[in-house]
């Protein structure tokens, strides 16, 4: 016969079992005890392994390379894919070599606003990936006004198509960050060899979206790959307000072409990725993978 004291003990045990402390070792099965909404989402919408069970999951570390001097008036950033051609590694990147340091809104015709202002596209080579030799002159130099990208060109990436080489990069026709944010769209240069000479098109190949659309103010970080026999050029886009008034801050889209010089047609599914600051895509199995 159950007494009142026995009933109280049973209820207390049930209570304790229902509200036991969550263990340090994450259970592979969803706990039966009451858990927070965040833990519920871990099991219902994600998984307790997080990314560690993804076959692409990895770690990396920074390592020092040689061949690039350091200076307050020199900026190197936004490296392209590194490609290996006839035993030589090639990389292209944004490079600013100016008389002064970036001055923000005090920028002038000769003083940059930011690290990506008054830049050209530079090229370096290496036999081992550790020791690099920078070319004495830019691979692609800004064209004269009013050609596209006369103020600055940056964030390049390389495409090899039918034995020719194509560098896609964003071009600025105004001082970055002064009037309308980092307003830049994508243009391209072509060459017969990775050593150049490079011939800039001087025109936009992937343009801004219409006013009010998600990519109306920025087409940044072009990342071309070949997929299904076509050129898939991924890019980062942002609207004119860039997060103000509830607008999207940034996302990633793709434009597709059968010719490196275009026309590029934006996907009807854009934006295809709603997070990530830079574009980094690569063919993977039967599709495409992204680092975001």
Regions found by a protein language model. Name each.
Residues 1-7:
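Bacterial N-terminal signal peptides that target proteins for export
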Residues 7-24:
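Bacterial Sec-dependent signal peptides at the C-terminal "C-region" and cleavage site
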Residues 21-292:
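Carbohydrate-active catalytic/glycan-binding domains of CAZyme proteins
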């Amino acid at each position: 016969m159950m007494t009142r004291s026995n009933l109280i003990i049973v209820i207390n045990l049930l209570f304790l079992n229902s509200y036991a402390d969550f263990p340090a070792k994450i259970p592979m099965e969803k706990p039966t005890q009451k858990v927070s909404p965040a833990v519920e989402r871990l099991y219902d919408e994600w998984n307790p392994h997080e990314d560690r069970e993804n076959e692409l999951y990895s770690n990396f570390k920074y390592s020092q390379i040689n061949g690039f001097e350091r200076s307050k008036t020199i900026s190197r950033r936004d490296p392209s894919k590194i490609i290996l051609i006839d035993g030589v590694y090639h990389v292209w990147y944004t490079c600013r070599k100016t008389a002064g340091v970036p001055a923000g809104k005090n920028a002038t015709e000769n003083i940059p606003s930011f690290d990506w202002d008054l830049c050209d596209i530079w090229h370096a080579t290496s036999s081992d990936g550790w020791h690099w030799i920078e070319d004495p002159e830019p691979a692609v130099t800004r064209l004269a006004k009013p050609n596209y990208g006369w103020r600055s060109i940056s964030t390049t990436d390389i495409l090899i198509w039918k034995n020719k080489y194509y560098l896609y990069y964003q071009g600025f026709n105004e001082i970055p960050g002064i009037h309308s944010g980092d307003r830049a769209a994508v243009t391209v240069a072509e060459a017969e060899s990775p050593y150049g000479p490079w011939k800039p098109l001087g025109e936009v190949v992937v343009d801004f979206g219409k006013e009010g659309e998600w990519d109306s103010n920025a087409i940044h970080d072009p990342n071309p790959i070949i997929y299904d026999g076509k050129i898939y050029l991924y890019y980062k886009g942002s609207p004119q307000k860039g997060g103000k008034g509830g607008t999207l801050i940034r996302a990633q889209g793709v434009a597709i072409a059968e010719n490196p010089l275009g026309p590029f047609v934006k996907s009807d599914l854009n934006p295809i990725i709603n997070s990530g600051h830079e574009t980094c895509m690569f063919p993977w199995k039967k599709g495409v993978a992204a680092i975001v």
